[in-house]
Amino acid sequence: MDRRLLEILACPICKGKLVYSQDEQELICRFDKLVYPIHDGIPVMLPDSTRPLIER
């Protein structure tokens, strides 16, 4: 994923910073504990597309 894009993307719910997980191809909002999927290199930023973050 393009680093410039990562710098401007924000969580659509809290407007906070997102963390990119290259291994899982996901964007993570640690504040809301939500995970946004990335499909074919395109972040899916719809609130209905999230899943809860399960921290390991």
Swiss-Prot record:
Cellular-component GO terms for this entry: cytosol
Gene3D superfamilies: 2.20.25.10
InterPro entries for this protein: Trm112-like
SUPFAM superfamilies membership: Trm112p-like
Pfam families reported in the protein's UniProt record: Trm112p
Similarity section: Belongs to the UPF0434 family.
UniProt name for this protein: UPF0434 protein CbuG_1535
Lineage: Bacteria, Pseudomonadati, Pseudomonadota, Gammaproteobacteria, Legionellales
